[in-house]
Amino acid sequence: MFSLQEICRKNIYFLPDWLSEHVIQRLGLYWEKHGSLQRIGDDYVLIQQDLIIPINEALRMAGEEGSDEVVQLLLLWEGNIHYAIIGALEGDHYSLIRKLYDQIEDCHDILPLIQDPKIFEKCHELDKSCNILCLVLHAVKNDMPCILQDYKTHLSGEDIQVVFETACRSQKYDIVRWMGQNIAIYNPEVIFNIAFDKINTTLLSIGYTLLFNHRINNMNENIDSLLTQHLEWAAGMGLLHFMLETLKYGGDVTIAVLSEAVKYDHRKVLDYFLRRKNLYQEDLEELLLLAIRADCSKKTLNLLLSYLNYSINNIRKKILQCVKEYETTIIIKILWKRKINLIGPILADFIGYHSYTYMVDFMREFSIHPEKMIKMAARESREDLIIKFSKNVCKEPKDRLHYLKSLVYTMRHKEGKQLLIYTIHNLYKACHLESKEMFNLARFYARHNAVIQFKSICQDLSKLNINIKNLLLECLRIAIKKNYPQLIRTIKTDMSYE
């Protein structure tokens, strides 16, 4: 529990002028050799009614003087204990240091507040479990290169590697330069990995400077392949400024490099280099095919097509193959708007294995008439699509039957026509037709040599006790005229029973 005096000391913000120095001392609001102490707001103190300083600066001063009583007062006023420890370290007051250090968890939290390398080391020594590598790593993070210089001979090659990576990740550029110039580093290429990871052009530039000006070990054996790798990485990440920085030191933007930009749809990188390079037609075509496979945006596809002047004659089949394999229609739509129609060739492939929902969207996107969709479905033996598309056109079964009959007349594909007739007959079975309509359907079957369906509807008519002799005669004339031998035999057989 706080005493009444402590509560007063913590919360008093105003000292009356009439209080004597003796009373102020008894209240514990007096700093030896400085005078009275008064709290000003949350962050400042007033000394001897004259000097205002930050509370943490006052804590550092009190710690340096070893004034435990003033330190406790300022901590009561919510000062930062780290500054008291720094001051105590500066004044070598170890009893106060031990007392204060027991109240904190980690000396490493204090290190960023210290600017003096000697105090930095003394503070780090408070943690008995830490080693030299730990000291150097924190020195690097807190811009204390002199500590690294002092202890570099105490570090193993593995330790040096860790310190170098830490300097790179912490973006301590001066330390990175100094290490690259003065210390043997096992894997210096890590600077480039970190530069790409952090997207840090400065670090990339430092790496190249060390590589070319100081020839840091093991990095000058495969410079060309290293630069090419960096260009590919940068292109794949869309980092044009990285590519331009790399090109200052060598390398070339090859098709392999541009392919990385295409794969990840970085149009700005492509645009920049396509404007400046005269690529062969074949190279542009390969980039376009890659863009289709990568499902790139319309803008990227249009960019590549523009450099081809929208001429795709050489790769038409390859485009269709990519569209089919990767199920992308963006390129088809772009070319369609340019009056280059690839819809027909791809429609058969798509309708062969895609769902009705997908094909409806495809039909709407490219304004394809349902008649074409149904005929193509018939060619590809997709009765399910025939039924669904025809339902979409005609809601009533009889209307649908007449609609499908009209398509048979213009259907040239033999197997497709047979499937349409088969679908029509199934539809006929599912709906009730008048005898006149059944006669018309029988004549339709005769005209198209649909023997099985003709025989079936004739049997249905006979079951209804309807005289079909005249119908058979009429259909026989049709069969003879069109030279349908099997249908002729079927009709003659039926006539023998009439």
UniProtKB/Swiss-Prot annotation:
Highest taxon in the source lineage = Viruses
State if Zinc is listed as a keyword. no
Q: Which InterPro entries match?
A: MGF_505
Q: Name one Pfam family in it.
A: DUF249
Q: Which UniProt keywords apply?
A: Early protein
Q: What induces it?
A: Expressed in the early phase of the viral replicative cycle.
What does it do?
Answer: Plays a role in virus cell tropism, and may be required for efficient virus replication in macrophages.
Q: Which family does it belong to?
A: Belongs to the asfivirus MGF 505 family.
Q: What is this protein called?
A: Protein MGF 505-5R
Annotated organism of origin? African swine fever virus (isolate Warthog/Namibia/Wart80/1980)
